[in-house]
């Protein structure tokens, strides 16, 4: 992995290049280790700027926040947003932000204002994320999110999927929306 990132950085050969690493071992089957981050930051401190951690491992995210200065750590799910912020992380980058953005902003503002409602807001955000996952479980996450966005925006264009995904039938759409609205 070090050779992979090195080759990209060297071939681009531009100090303006900024790389946010994506740690999603369930999909990539290749975890981004702390040792790799350490090596990359030592060799390319101007280019390697942060990571989105979609591993679901809160301790890993918090450890990165603690161990790497001037390195932006983003939680890959709203569930870990507040813990990452508290540990000095940058925030969250999440697939569901089209739907949860308002609540994410509320959590972020409450955190920055040291508001005593931040824990309550984070709990609401985590519940919203869990509800989205439940609603999308029967059709797949991407397709389910498209169905929900279509409903929220009253725009069927959101339901269009590219292969290998296919548009859901009406009964599945109704099921997804029913769960989401519960």
Residue positions per predicted region:
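Short amphipathic alpha-helical surface patches that mediate protein-protein
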Residues: 123-127, 150, 181
